[in-house]
Amino acid sequence: MILIASPFSLAHLEYLHTWHVTIKNIAQQHGLDIKVAIVVSTSHLNNFLPISGALNIECITFPSCGIKEIDLLWARIKLFQHYCAIGARLLWLVSADIRPPVSAWPAIADSLKKGADAVVIPYPSRWNNLIPTVIKEIVVHQKKCLVAVDARHLDTDTQIVGAGMGCIVLTLKALMVRLSIGKQPVKILWPDLHGTAEGIPLEGVEVGWFLNAYAHKLNIRCLGADHIAQHLT
């Protein structure tokens, strides 16, 4: 089974439908079962159920307001652990504030072909023809896909969380801490302005320092290491 967490917005239903159908078709071509998990606020759940049924989406609700940042972070980490426990091979977590430029998508696919075990990628602001190529690389090679978001947005923009556009299961801070605990080297790849991927090997706390320093500078972060799975569980 492949589990994809995706955003939700009443204003973007047509766009999301195209996105989900494309992912689903690619998965089915390779004989893979796919489930799309969407975090929505309780107030939007009833409006979204018909579409979720058609797309085989698991709706997971969170209160749309009144949650402290630490509580929300804990809840989403627990949700992430649940996804791992049920054997999800792919986690696609989304962000509403950072998105890769069109030129970055070829580098994402290239890094996957070169052996990256996981990809950290934000949800795109608009559809482009390169996205299916990246999705195919992730699905065929059973990569893990994660999106990291700075936790500061959780307490400054409740609408992002309430509308489901933020679907933040693992924040950048949480990812940084978990990777920093590990001692195995992790190769971090990122596309430059020309869309080509380059990387440097880091290990232990160096990983955390790198992610922290580039949190607001990089549009895409690809992480590759044999032991990355144990760092995230």
Swiss-Prot record:
Q: Which organism is it from?
A: African swine fever virus (strain Badajoz 1971 Vero-adapted)
Name by which UniProt lists this protein: Uncharacterized protein H233R
State the similarity comment.
Belongs to the asfivirus H233R family.
Q: Organism's domain of life? A: Viruses
The conditions that induce or repress this protein are given as: Expressed in the late phase of the viral replicative cycle.
Task: Give the keywords, sorted.
Answer: Late protein
